[in-house]
Amino acid sequence: MKIIIAGGTGFLGENLEKYFTEKGNEVYILTRNPQRKNEIYWDAKTIGEWKNSLEKADVLINLTGKSVDCRYHEKNKQEIYSSRIDSTKILQKAVDQCSEKPKIWMNASSATIYVHSEKHLNTEENGIIGDDFSMNICKSWEQEFFKIKNTEIRKVALRTSIVLGNNGGAFPKLKTVTKLGLGGKQGRGNQMVSWIHIDDFCKAIDWIIQNENISGIINITAPGPVSNETMMRKLRKELKAPFGLNAAVWQLEIASLFLKTETELLLKSRNVYPERLIKNGFKFSYPGFEEAILNLLES
């Protein structure tokens, strides 16, 4: 297959590139800073020569978007919004100009589109979508993606949870704070954490490509969300950390100022279930949190 990954130089893109290349596929990366032969320049805003790479592509995956791991002041909020909307808009324009369009287009979204929920399990069908900055970003992103219907292209929005891997994302940071004795619960610890092992993330993307009946919205998350308190306890156990200091909300607020991030990333309860993956027969290699982190710690 010929696979194009827009914004593919980050944690998820690197792992997808490795996964699909090892399976014998041609993978090309659209990036602002091309360094390798398979990397193609684009600015994620305007049509350029990169458009030609979409011709006869089997798969287009768009992961473009400024990281949400920052303070939500007006400049950052605008960049978070525009980086997602503009890239989706220009890809649609490029796809429309293709004579032989990609067969499937997967666009990043986020499991944070669902409301803070400790009890209600959010599925694609019965998930409750709320109204704040993060949720509205996701809603606008998906609306832009699905705005134009191309009958010959299968579109899938990936509502992805926290992805756990050793070479990026949240897991290396969680390991570090736990080893430093700071691996207690954050806030009340009741907030649910939806997560997925990086291997299952890549496998799920491959599975969606192969299953032509899958389109629309899909939750990319493991079937076993855990509370923040449980997550940190299991991490302490596997890392043999004798204790872990808890962090109250006020402490997290102060720390987030110094770290230039938002407490929402730790305190929001993301209680999400991959109903469509499960119902359609996808098999997780790591359905449980403990087995997932054991594998990562042994890797």
Please provide the spans of the model-predicted regions.
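C-terminal amphipathic/interface module of NAD(P)-dependent oxidoreductases
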Residues: 242-243, 263-299
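N-terminal Rossmann NAD(P)H-binding glycine-rich loop of SDR-like oxidoreductase domains
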Residues: 3-23
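Mid/C-terminal beta-alpha module of Rossmann-like enzyme folds, strongest
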Residues: 208-259, 294-297
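Alpha-helical substrate-binding/gating segment
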Residues: 175-184, 191-225
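NAD(P)H-binding glycine-rich loop region in Rossmannoid oxidoreductase-like domains
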Residues: 40-87
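Glycine-rich "substrate-gating" loop/helix at the edge of Rossmann-like oxidoreductase active sites
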Residues: 129-133, 161-168, 188-198, 209
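Conserved beta-loop-beta element that borders a ligand/cofactor-binding pocket
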Residues: 143-166
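Conserved Rossmann-fold NAD(P)-dependent oxidoreductase catalytic core, especially the SDR/UDP-sugar
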Residues: 89-131
